[in-house]
Amino acid sequence: MPRRRVIGQRKILPDPKFGSELLAKFVNILMVDGKKSTAEAIVYTALETLAQRSGKDHLEAFEVALDNVRPTVEVKSRRVGGSTYQVPVEVRPVRRNALAMRWIVEAARKRGDKSMALRLANELSDAAENKGTAVKKREDVHRMAEANKAFAHYRW
């Protein structure tokens, strides 16, 4: 890793329908083999379903679901004198969003519904209600951090 300069984050173009950078990032995470239009169609269909179920605005419903999955702490391995400790660290805001979106997409892919749009809509509505696989993943990460709170002084 070169140490000359810090490379800034790439600017992401907002999505064409809602003008949200967060949604554009979500589409990019869902995208497989560079098929962006397919990923966009899936996300927009899922958001439409989610908005009908919740009675909220598309972006607002998506934001609520994402909020319930965002982790605040995680554990990182730290080697100290021959033994490895799981040290709890706070998650940076950009990584919070990335992890939440990744977990939602992973959970949706594992579901057994008919179409990906339906799976995604179901996972997002579960996340909005604080249940589902993605929320369980966040709770597991938080539980792990809580269990290893004793090693917090090894932070770097």
Swiss-Prot record:
Alphabetical keyword list: Ribonucleoprotein, Ribosomal protein, RNA-binding, rRNA-binding, tRNA-binding
Any matching Pfam family: Ribosomal_S7
GO molecular function: rRNA binding; structural constituent of ribosome; tRNA binding
Domain of life per record: Bacteria
Tagged with keyword Ribosomal protein: yes
Gene Ontology CC: small ribosomal subunit
Family: Belongs to the universal ribosomal protein uS7 family.
Function as written in the Swiss-Prot or TrEMBL entry: One of the primary rRNA binding proteins, it binds directly to 16S rRNA where it nucleates assembly of the head domain of the 30S subunit. Is located at the subunit interface close to the decoding center, probably blocks exit of the E-site tRNA.
Assembly: Part of the 30S ribosomal subunit. Contacts proteins S9 and S11.
Protein name stated in the entry: Small ribosomal subunit protein uS7
Originating species: Pectobacterium carotovorum subsp. carotovorum (strain PC1)
